[in-house]
Amino acid sequence: MNKTITPSIDSINRQWYLVDAENQTLGRLATEVASVLRGKNKPSFTPHLDTGDFVIIVNAEKIKVTGKKGMQKLYRRHSGRPGGMKVETFNSLQERIPERIVEKAIKGMLPHNALGRQLFRKLKVYKGSEHPHSAQNPQVLSITTNELVK
């Protein structure tokens, strides 16, 4: 009888990927990045282990959403105090903190436990095209989307 081989933490080879979010659709980008963070693109994927890679996302302020989501999509946060609910639209949050939009979309697609928090720490999102991780020699990860042509 064959036994399932669980990769050891030392044997996991982690790579760094660079993703340009310019003119990408938010959800389609987030699903691909979440899959790479989990390690589902590797043959050694194990659901209960962190086998994923590091992902750097640049140009977060140029990400797109379809339809009227720019005005209608709401982001909520609460200070924990009575009456402390703050509501903000996609457009206003994109002007203020565009990194948070991408981070929140990807975080919702990761496991909601300690493993998900560990995976989320391997995501680096930046507003502009510059990032401080050039020493890691990130590979460019191209994400192609099937867009409808009007």
Swiss-Prot record:
- Family the entry assigns: Belongs to the universal ribosomal protein uL13 family.
Keywords attached to this Swiss-Prot or TrEMBL record, sorted alphabetically, are:
Ribonucleoprotein, Ribosomal protein
Q: How does it assemble?
A: Part of the 50S ribosomal subunit.
Which Pfam families does the annotation name? Ribosomal_L13 (PF00572)
State the signal peptide span. none
Region of interest called Disordered, as start-end residue ranges on this chain: 130-150
Name of this protein: Large ribosomal subunit protein uL13
> What organism does the UniProt record list as the source?
Prochlorococcus marinus (strain SARG / CCMP1375 / SS120)
Question: Which residue windows does the record flag with biased composition (Polar residues)?
Answer: 134-150
Function comment: This protein is one of the early assembly proteins of the 50S ribosomal subunit, although it is not seen to bind rRNA by itself. It is important during the early stages of 50S assembly.
Q: Does the keyword Ribosomal protein apply?
A: yes
List, in alphabetical order, the GO biological process terms annotated in this UniProt record.
negative regulation of translation; translation
Q: Which domain of life is it from?
A: Bacteria
Q: Which residues form a coiled coil?
A: none
Gene3D superfamilies linked: Ribosomal protein L13
